[in-house]
């Protein structure tokens, strides 16, 4: 079964020193069954990697290699993220006091009836309240 992947798990995998067994298991599952992400996921991931370059955490070669590796994974970008932004996503953000970015992952998991892979404690709490299966921690 596929899953919804957020940037916290993605970046923990990219920065392998931060990867746990659970994070590695998520990516084994992504390789096997694929993942869904909201339309903003690529921007979130690329932004953190770019900020890492600017702050001297990594270099441009690391950033580029990480993005190239991620591009090879069977990850489907949801084409309906923006359609739900001002409706279901905004309501979830308000209900659980999430950013709209985090609520987009929650909305996608709920809409597609998929488990959610996140390390974010607030998003995990909201997903649990919505009876969404959680993985990755």
Roles of regions detected by a PLM:
Residues 1-40, 52, 57-65, 130:
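Short, well-structured N-terminal submotif of metal-dependent ribonuclease cores
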